[in-house]
From Swiss-Prot:
Protein name per the record: 1,4-alpha-glucan branching enzyme GlgB
UniProt record similarity statement: Belongs to the glycosyl hydrolase 13 family. GlgB subfamily.
Signal peptide: none
EC number: 2.4.1.18
GO CC term, one of those recorded: cytosol
Organism: Streptococcus mutans serotype c (strain ATCC 700610 / UA159)
Pathway where this protein functions: Glycan biosynthesis; glycogen biosynthesis
Molecular function GO terms recorded: 1,4-alpha-glucan branching enzyme activity; cation binding; hydrolase activity, hydrolyzing O-glycosyl compounds
Catalytically driven reaction(s): Transfers a segment of a (1->4)-alpha-D-glucan chain to a primary hydroxy group in a similar glucan chain
Amino acid sequence: MNEREALRTFGTGENFHAQHYFGFHETEKNGVKGYIFRVWAPNAEDLHLIGDFTGWFDNPLQMDKNEAGVWEVFTDLPKEGHIYKYLVKRQGGQIVEKMDPFAIYLEERPGTGSLIRTIPEKKWKDGLWLGRRKRWGFFKRPVNIYEVHAGSWKQNEDGSPYSFEQLKDELVPYLVKMNYTHVEFMPLMAHPLGMSWGYQLMGFFAFEHTYGTPEQFQDFVEACHLNNIGVIVDWVPGHFTQNDDALAYFDGTPTFEYQDHDRAHNYRWGALNFDLGKNQVQSFLISSAKFWIDFYHIDGIRVDAVSNMLYLDYDEGPWQPNIEGNNRNLEGYYFLQRLNTVLKLAHPDVMMIAEESTATTKITGRREEGGLGFDYKWNMGWMNDILKFYEEDPIYRKYDFNLVTFSFMYLFSENFILPFSHDEVVHGKKSLMHKMWGDRYNQFAGLRNLYTYQICHPGKKLLFMGSEFGQFLEWKYDHALEWTNLEEEDGLNLKMQDFTSQLNQFYKDHKVLWQLDTSYDGLEIIDADNVDESVLSFIRKNEKGDLLVCVFNMVPVERKGFTIGVPVAGIYEEVWNTELEEFGGVWKEHNMTVKTQKNLWKEYENTLSFTLPALGASIWKIKRRLRK
């Protein structure tokens, strides 16, 4: 794309590689080698380039403005490693220093400048992974995600977070050991506070320097791919930090944000909302998403805070109805549809995931049918119901059994991911282990039951770091995980970690748990009405008709001779039991194999009887089918 076309399409919202035009680029002019700098600031009164190469304010370089509101200057003064900023004179005379919105490198805090650094093109070695990803897709593949905050998974002795060079050496082998299929990172784009959650971004192309360099993250992704692990990143296209040195009121007027003050300001999060209806903003944001896919070979993008982009009244501040008289953010709907259209045309094998907390329909619906076009939506309703149920005293669970079964009413209205995310283990909500009912032993039993239910329930899976070994304390973004839990004398945390690893492998090994995740063809409810005993049972199936019988005892009462109906007569073997001693339970071995009996049980003609462990989950597989 030539420069004229790049400028034109940026203004029409159709430049999806805007970083190739904006920012700084090495070039040659009149036989002189140097750099050209470009920035969009349509309403600035004047604009200069300053940096190490100008003595900062000593000799600022005047930039020229074109008819599209883009300022540019060519200079041979900068050197590799120099820091630069834009000196923006706003209408009215105020002068502010701004970072480059398209910078890939930002200087280390407390500095706020952008860095001139050329990143050599990487010779990737993950072609086999990318080829399989394109060939296999993900809907009929196992997806089990380990959610990570890069700054607090592990830390150095001085309290600094691991770099991605260190994470490559330690996190990648851990993901392999724990049998996860994907890792998802909370925001890695530059944000004002390194030790934070990271959801108020300042650099949408820049890598957060707290975690190392872009090259280190490229190497990390490659290492993941070479070990058959996909990488997903969180991305926040709805709002951005209101820090004055970043995007906020860039040229002195609403530039990236809405013109209307109330729409521009996000009162709940103390941030600014992108004007999603502005063409230049669409070019900027879609270019950002595409850059992370192309440059880092990532396998998925989780779009944060989608609800805030869809509803004018989602925030706590004042709002005005749209032209149709309702609360829908029409620009937000259009932008998300366009985002998914563009990205899926270029990368149909990259997952687009929505973190959306309302009852809005068609989040994963087809765009041509009015849907937003995401591949998956986090099932926040399921998560809230399930955690409320597992926190409850078992005596009362029969009165709230609908919390466990309600999801079967809307299972396939969207393509869901079942998340136990960072949001559920902070702000006094307690860790997942601490949420569980009972003493320490029963809490671990409940956790094993919970994770098995998540694995067996239709939908892809996500678990936040630390939960895999039952960390007791809440997550703190400025503290490393409690790895010392694994050294507890009773060994329950270590056994919990091993349980999670084996459960994840069990999931990968059984197609019935993931091949038909978006259809009732993959699910058959045996009994969702046994509220008095608080036992839930259902069957998962694959395309060949193989099946697993999944039974969950939600109370601490062992049930001998427990009987359910099954659709196939045969010899059944127990292939999973959460109460085995090796997992921290009390059972020394599995149930013995069981032959079905010919009895009428509801609509079934065959029954299966076995001992159901207290507060346990038991999964059965047909070892040999019997003739009718």
